[in-house]
Amino acid sequence: MAAATVGRDTLPEHWSYGVCRDGRVFFINDQLRCTTWLHPRTGEPVNSGHMIRSDLPRGWEEGFTEEGASYFIDHNQQTTAFRHPVTGQFSPENSEFILQEEPNPHMSKQDRNQRPSSMVSETSTAGTASTLEAKPGPKIIKSSSKVHSFGKRDQAIRRNPNVPVVVRGWLHKQDSSGMRLWKRRWFVLADYCLFYYKDSREEAVLGSIPLPSYVISPVAPEDRISRKYSFKAVHTGMRALIYNSSTAGSQAEQSGMRTYYFSADTQEDMNAWVRAMNQAAQVLSRSSLKRDMEKVERQAVPQANHTESCHECGRVGPGHTRDCPHRGHDDIVNFERQEQEGEQYRSQRDPLEGKRDRSKARSPYSPAEEDALFMDLPTGPRGQQAQPQRAEKNGMLPASYGPGEQNGTGGYQRAFPPRTNPEKHSQRKSNLAQVEHWARAQKGDSRSLPLDQTLPRQGPGQSLSFPENYQTLPKSTRHPSGGSSPPPRNLPSDYKYAQDRASHLKMSSEERRAHRDGTVWQLYEWQQRQQFRHGSPTAPICLGSPEFTDQGRSRSMLEVPRSISVPPSPSDIPPPGPPRVFPPRRPHTPAERVTVKPPDQRRSVDISLGDSPRRARGHAVKNSSHVDRRSMPSMGYMTHTVSAPSLHGKSADDTYLQLKKDLEYLDLKMTGRDLLKDRSLKPVKIAESDTDVKLSIFCEQDRVLQDLEDKIRALKENKDQLESVLEVLHRQMEQYRDQPQHLEKIAYQQKLLQEDLVHIRAELSRESTEMENAWNEYLKLENDVEQLKQTLQEQHRRAFFFQEKSQIQKDLWRIEDVTAGLSANKENFRILVESVKNPERKTVPLFPHPPVPSLSTSESKPPPQPSPPTSPVRTPLEVRLFPQLQTYVPYRPHPPQLRKVTSPLQSPTKAKPKVEDEAPPRPPLPELYSPEDQPPAVPPLPREATIIRHTSVRGLKRQSDERKRDRELGQCVNGDSRVELRSYVSEPELATLSGDMAQPSLGLVGPESRYQTLPGRGLSGSTSRLQQSSTIAPYVTLRRGLNAESSKATFPRPKSALERLYSGDHQRGKMSAEEQLERMKRHQKALVRERKRTLGQGERTGLPSSRYLSRPLPGDLGSVC
């Protein structure tokens, strides 16, 4: 992958670089006239088609043969070996192969003449041979059908953790073999490479895909992919193979190429991934802008690479970088290997041999295809007989050179600045003659010059030769003499310009000749290629019209000043860079490489009539009969003149009108720039008063709250989704409890989701805290604005002058408008913050229980009151079960959960009832009786208290009948002036009830009911821990509407809670105070009689165990009946 940054500024002097058609980058030494794959400064390859491994020394790479054997390439010594250069061991992948080292691992002449039929990553390198003769040196005796792919786990490129990540996320990837199932993988796009992992922890890379050699696009119907939001990554070589072969699928897989299919979850994710991956795939073309990746990809025949003829060894090709700086082999990207099995790959072994080889070569393409295919890159050896080079301005060759050398398809020619003006004049005449003869040739004119003096029109009978000593590009693949042209291509592209060229390629020569616009368009392309090749906007190339060439050379050869330059459209113009001084360049090198951003990312720029050669220029192609505004190619450097072809075939008046229109367009552009410069530099005052400042800050805080609300809402949605999925996994865990394999998979998924859930909850809590802080600040600002409003209203009332009142009124209106606009969101913010502070459902008590006041500050704290841990509000069933639970709770003199609170009289409306029948919290154990009451009697021994557990069946039946009758008679609704007893008190406590009821300030207010709980009095002189632990804390709940008369009544002893527990009375009816007291009195009498009856029997049973004591009999606390 990209181990070094490519760029003109990063290269030393006399160095340049070239880009192969498949995206590989090599470097050219203009002094030694040789090529290398290694960057001259870093000593590492940038993109040579092989893998860079971290465990290899500098200048080493790993390659793979067609059979799948791994070998190592030393670009420093230009050798290959199967052994690791550091460990000296064979790769574990080669265990199934029989490897045989050759004594001379360098490439031989015979090897360079033969082209392997398939190779890794669409490259022809020294290490990717498929035959015994064309291998990197070591022989592979065992042949195998194993196909290497970068996406495999073992051959994956190691990811550099220091490179920032562009995009990461989940995608579905289709398997390359088997049933081609879709698997969900975690993908990371970094360092122009797509890595994928099993999960988001990114622990072990499953595979990697180097994107610069791929094109990413949505799936097509022929892909037979029915999955939604699917897209694919197709290798550039695969694309040409698909368009040229009907059986490209299997052949592509067999030749080492592969198409990757991906699927996103949403359309937005798919668009984002396709955009990011395409940008990574085109990074080389964007960084250099010397060759547009889109155009390189569109070319239907292999584009020749930079190839240098080395003086020491007389060889050409980027193979120098793999084998040696002075020896190498052809490294040609062949996109049509399936159709060209018999073609031969030749290299220049010596000047004479090279001439003989090139004289035999023939071009299978028509002249129009020649121009269309070799427009952007100065291609390989396609020229006339070599002649001594002469220095010409801008790299233009004298007229004696064949036009094929000047139209961008000739060999590389070194050029130097001119010294005399006659040379410039000769250049103009030469170019003019070339244009005319080329136009005649396109129209089939028999009066054209001899074949070797025309523009690029090379037929089968034309002889080809090279300049003698220095070639920039290797030979492109050619058909044998007499071979037919390849079928038309239709390569997709993002630019309309590419579509025009693709449709142009589909046309036959006759159609092209018949289409008059096609001729003009080809002439325009040739002109632009000439100017691009020679790298200067001031190279005067005056073109004649095809219509004028038939009438002679003397008509209307307009030479328009080069400064008149009309861009095609503002969106196609890259912004001009700052002026820089560049060292002497190669003639065909563009003056500047400018990154062209997509249209949606460009900013509008103004292009002036600057004379800088680095300004991008556009042009609208027109003729007399058809006006077609074509899109120009996005190139780092393009020179478009107003002269050619938009002025062809027009009279003087038409030409004047055309030039006037162009100048008006430029005037408009200049007007915008002048207005920009003449803008007033008057400072801007945002706020006029402190009211403006305060309101702006207030609105800013509202925006902060909105952003936080959006984040919290998104996090909550993610949390809910994760929790729902985890709930399903929990059910699956229970369902597949007997299947360990399923359990392991489910547990692994559950672990990952739980980690994500923890992360989301932590983020949600953090955002909620920020939301709460922002809300507090919002309330503070709101209060400040309200105070400011009141102040302004007061000033408005006291203001005397009309102007002052008007200004204050404006400020008041501003405040009113802002507050009215913000009021819509305020309620949402408040609900969100309150949901965090006070959630609706409180399953676990997050706060202490409601506090209980004491009788006085001098009294000691009451003993603890145990409570069920499940809910702070006790249900009626829990109240009945509570005495049984109290037996096992030890005594604590200072309970931590009880605190003193404000008296209910001070805040009588704080308690908000929700359910009328819910019982209030149970009060703590009482300590003292009121002074006027008699002290209670000593409770009975534990063995007597347990007799109630052995009540006879007849006694229990009698109690049950009485309770049933009471329920039938007591179904009445309490009024506000009636007393409702929620629990039961003993007889000594009833004696003091009248005094307690007169003191409502000592009561408890339930949190969700309107009842006041009056705590009963405990034992004043009790010292026994057993007695205290076994004493039940009775309490009475009264309506707040109690009057003094009803509170002074003397109540009989009610039935204890323990008796109610054994009686099974689970439905309590609402009874009046009189009915309830009467019922309790009857029960008390029945209990006393029953106790006396069974007293003797209880002494004989002998079960005195305090551990089983639930509570003392309430009747024994003071039997007054």
UniProtKB/Swiss-Prot annotation:
The modification Phosphoserine is found at S536, S545, S569, S604, S608, S612, S858, S860, S867, S871, S903, S907, S986. Residues 105-137, 299-514, 547-632, 841-876, 888-971, 1003-1028, 1082-1121 are annotated as: Disordered. Keywords: Cell junction, Coiled coil, Cytoplasm, Cytoskeleton, Phosphoprotein, Repeat. SMART domains: PH, WW. It is found in: Cell junction, Adherens junction; Cytoplasm; Cytoplasm, Cytoskeleton, Microtubule organizing center, Centrosome. Pfam families: PH (PF00169). InterPro entries: PH-like_dom_sf, PH_domain, PKHA4-7_PH, WW_dom, WW_dom_sf. Interacts with CAMSAP3 and CTNND1. Interacts (via WW domains) with TSPAN33 (via cytoplasmic domain) and with PDZD11; the interaction with TSPAN33 is dependent on PDZD11 being bound to PLEKHA7 and facilitates the docking of ADAM10 to zonula adherens through interaction of TSPAN33 with ADAM10. This is Pleckstrin homology domain-containing family A member 7. Residues 9-42, 54-87 form the WW domain. Residues 567-582, 861-871, 933-942 have a biased composition (Pro residues). It comes from the Eukaryota. The modification Phosphothreonine is found at T870. Residues 700-801, 1067-1094 form a coiled coil. Residues 308-356, 437-446, 497-514, 589-605, 958-969 have a biased composition (Basic and acidic residues). Required for zonula adherens biogenesis and maintenance. Acts via its interaction with CAMSAP3, which anchors microtubules at their minus-ends to zonula adherens, leading to the recruitment of KIFC3 kinesin to the junctional site. Mediates docking of ADAM10 to zonula adherens through a PDZD11-dependent interaction with the ADAM10-binding protein TSPAN33. Residues 538-696 are annotated as: Interaction with CTNND1. One of its GO terms (molecular function) is delta-catenin binding. It comes from Homo sapiens.
